[in-house]
Structures are given as structure tokens and as C-alpha cells.
């Protein structure tokens, strides 16, 4: 069942440099940005991953991997598994829901769902506005809304999330595990999942081949 999860509070981003690929300073938080895994990433769960940071503060960080499909399951099938509908053919999903991707959002709480969506949809006490017109909702109500045609225009559903303890993400960035850059809705919600990693690098002016050759020196 999709349920609300604890997450660190959003931090003050006033001192953040947009599009910065280097280390971050203490108190300079990355919610609303993308993390891009470096080729030296040893954890296979995050290899070539692009992660949208939903919350980052002194309490830690939480994000959703936006380029890792959850096998062959699609959104209508998931609605059946969650008992929102009995059969996919019983409902007529709007076009954006028919193509809605189900992703592996990360290794934490993989039995729970988290919906990243455009900011044209809001549920009081459930929706977290993040940045650049992107919000996060983690209740089953948003799935019912999408199924009935009353949901957000753009959305992706992720099973699980990526989480970091206090200071852990900062350390990984300093150790050249991640690059980071500004996010945009077209990249986050795009259907070209296989291209998201290269597109994120291009936002920093980096060619993937060049990054591979210079791993650890970005």
C-alpha cells in the first residue's frame, strides 16, 4: 500500500550555486536538484542513476531514482495489485496515466510507493512541494485521483526511495561519488528513461565518454 513515509525536512537553499558539479558547503542543501552517479560508483544499485532529491537537511537526505524501471509492471497493473480497480480494462485512464512509468525509486521501503508529480495537484497534509513545479505525494489517494482522471498532468510512481544519514550525502559528494545539477520537469517526467543519465550530464556540459575517462576528477 502506498503510504506516507518519514523524511528529513527541506533545508534553506538560499546559498546554493545552480548547476554546481563540485562539493557542497555545510548548510547548502540540494533538495530540488538531481544527483548523477559517477562512473566510480561501486554500489550497483546506484550505477548510472539519476536521483531527484526531495528533501535534504542536517537530518539527512531523501530522493527518488528517476531512471530505473521496476521491471515490466505498468501503472494499470499496479492499480490492480493495490485493489484500486479489479481489472485494467475496467477503467479508462487519461493519456498521461497510460504511459506513466513505475520505477525503482531506491533500496529503502521498497514496498511503498512515492509519486513525483507536477504541482497542479495537491493534497493537504500529504503533498510536499519541492522545487521548480515538482511535488511529492505518498498516499494512495493520488493513485485514485490519477485513475479517475483527476490527478496531476505529469507523474511518475516510484517503489522505494534512496536515503542518507546526516552528513552521508555530503561525504559521498566530496568523495566524487556524485555530481549534482538543477533539475527540470522535462527530464524528471520524460519517457526516455534510458536517456536520462546522458541528458543530466549534458546539463553540466559533460559528455559521458569524457566523464568515464576522467572518473574521480570532475
Curated annotation (Swiss-Prot):
The record's listing under SUPFAM superfamilies reads:
VC0467-like
For this protein, the record's InterPro entries field holds: AlgH-like (IPR003774)
One GO cellular component, as annotated: cytosol
Among Gene3D superfamilies, the record links this protein to: VC0467-like
Residue ranges for the region (Disordered) are 1-26
Q: Which domain of life is it from?
A: Bacteria
Alphabetical list of HAMAP family matching this protein: UPF0301
Please give the NCBIfam families that the UniProt record associates with this protein: PRK00228.1-4
Protein family (similarity comment) = Belongs to the UPF0301 (AlgH) family.
Can you say what this protein is called? UPF0301 protein RPB_4502
Taxonomic source organism:
Rhodopseudomonas palustris (strain HaA2)
Amino acid at each position: 500500500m502506498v503510504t506516507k513515509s518519514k523524511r528529513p525536512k527541506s533545508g534553506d537553499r538560499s546559498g546554493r550555486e545552480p548547476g554546481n558539479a563540485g562539493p557542497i558547503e555545510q548548510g547548502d542543501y540540494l533538495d530540488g536538484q538531481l544527483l548523477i552517479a559517477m562512473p566510480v560508483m561501486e554500489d550497483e544499485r546506484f550505477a548510472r542513476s539519476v536521483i531527484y532529491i526531495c528533501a535534504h537537511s542536517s537530518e539527512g537526505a531523501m530522493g527518488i531514482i528517476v531512471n530505473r524501471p521496476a521491471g515490466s509492471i505498468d501503472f494499470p497493473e499496479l492499480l490492480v495489485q493495490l485493489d484500486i480497480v479489479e481489472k485494467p480494462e475496467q477503467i479508462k485512464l487519461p493519456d498521461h496515466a497510460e504511459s506513466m512509468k513505475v520505477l525503482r525509486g531506491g533500496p529503502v521501503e521498497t514496498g511503498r510507493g512515492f509519486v513525483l508529480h507536477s504541482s497542479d495537484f495537491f493534497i493537504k497534509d500529504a503533498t510536499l512541494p519541492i522545487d521548480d513545479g515538482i511535488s511529492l505525494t505518498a498516499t494512495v489517494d493520488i493513485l485514485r485521483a490519477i485513475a479517475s482522471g483527476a490527478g496531476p498532468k505529469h507523474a511518475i510512481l516510484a517503489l522505494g526511495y534512496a536515503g542518507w544519514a546526516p552528513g552521508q550525502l555530503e561525504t559521498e559528494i566530496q568523495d566524487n561519488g556524485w555530481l549534482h545539477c538543477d533539475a527540470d520537469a522535462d527530464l524528471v517526467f520524460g519517457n526516455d528513461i534510458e536517456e536520462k543519465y546522458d541528458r543530466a550530464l549534458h546539463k553540466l556540459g559533460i559528455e559521458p565518454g569524457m566523464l568515464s575517462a576522467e572518473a574521480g576528477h570532475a
